[in-house]
Design a protein with these regions (language model features):
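Generic structural signal for alpha-helix termini and adjacent loop/cap motifs
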Residues: 22, 42-43, 290, 300
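Cytosolic ends of transmembrane helices, especially the final helix of ABC transmembrane type-1 domains
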Residues: 5, 10-40
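Pre-NBD coupling/linker segments of ABC/ABC-like ATPases
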Residues: 40-55, 287
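ABC-type nucleotide-binding domain
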Residues: 53-314
């Protein structure tokens, strides 16, 4: 009788424990229901609604642009105004959270300005066909996708209509500094870039960045956006790629985000952001001569290097 009582008690405890576990799991999953319902309630954006672009993008203007992300009253961008022209390379610099990536996303129409206007060739970006605009822009963000495809497919996926253009493919691989990466793969361009596949391999972050840069360049565009695509590369590789970019994209508008002093000097103009505001703009020489916030950012990079050099000498 005691054994039966003990066994029954164990079963009851087990059932209670299982019930509590299931209840806790249900509660955790219920927390996501509100987000799921919000997703269901979202209206699908009509990317083909608006005026199509009939001319290449020659100018981009931000006119008193403010932006705050959904569910927050804090502005990520505040009263930002500037004009960009084609045939120039622009660099964005600022501390983390200063609004650099946000600015690029607004340009891609991933978000709408809270206040102010963005003009493309003098036309309000909100009046322009979204799909047509994005076809003219090639971008690589920090969280770029690493497709479980072949190396070739990872590059040509940005422009499937010209995926068989082997000359263009070879050129962008060289421009992105990815030739050494491809040559080191067991099946070169036909290598699967994910372990688990027959003959597949996994790349380092720096190698992936070069593949992603080649992907961005394979799509011939009016505007090229690079959001810190060189973070895992050494300074020499970054300078080499930017120099090649300047040659390849000389008829376009190129914008890149970087924190490296050596690469900033290769830009025609630099936009300096601080806490969401555009505080300075000009060439590297002009900004250095002004001796303001840009100079502080550069000095913060150079001083540790000088200190290490002094330690080496001792």
């Amino acid at each position: 009788t005691i054994n039966l009582y003990t066994s029954s008690l164990d079963q009851i405890q087990s059932a209670i424990f299982s019930f509590c576990t299931q209840l806790n799991t249900f509660y955790e999953q219920a927390l996501y229901l509100e987000s799921l319902f919000d997703l269901f309630d979202m209206q699908t954006e009509d990317e083909n609604c608006g005026t199509p672009l009939t001319e290449p993008i020659r100018t981009i203007e931000f006119r008193h642009v403010y932006f705050s992300y959904p569910a927050t009253n804090v502005y990520a961008l505040k009263n930002v105004s500037f004009v960009l022209d084609d045939r120039h390379t622009y660099a964005l610099i600022g501390l983390n959270g200063s609004g650099k990536t946000t600015l690029l996303k607004l340009l891609m129409k991933l978000y709408k300005p809270t206040l102010g206007t963005i003009l493309i060739n003098g036309q309000d970006i909100e009046e322009i066909d979204t799909a047509g605009l994005r076809k003219r822009i090639s971008a690589i963000f920090q969280d770029f996708i690493k497709y479980p495809f072949t190396a070739e497919e990872n590059i040509t996926i940005s422009d499937l209509e010209n995926a068989n253009d082997l000359h263009r493919l070879s050129k962008v691989i060289d421009d992105a500094g990815a030739a050494e990466v491809i040559d080191g793969l067991p099946h070169r361009l036909q290598t699967q870039l994910q372990k688990g596949w027959n003959g597949g391999t996994e790349l380092s972050q720096g190698q992936w960045q070069k593949i992603a840069i080649a992907r961005c360049l394979f799509k011939q565009s009016d505007v090229y956006l690079f959001d810190e695509p060189f973070s895992a590369l050494d300074a020499i590789s970054e300078q080499h790629i930017i120099k090649r970019l300047n040659l390849k994209t000389k008829m376009s508008i190129t914008i890149f985000i970087t924190h490296r002093y050596s690469s900033l000097r290769l830009a025609d103009f630099i936009l300096v952001l601080k806490d969401g505001e555009l505080v300075e703009s000009g060439s590297h020489q002009e900004l250095q001569k002004a001796g303001k916030y840009y100079s502080e950012l550069i000095k913060a990079q150079i001083e540790p290097i000088d200190h290490l050099a002094q330690l080496d000498e001792t």
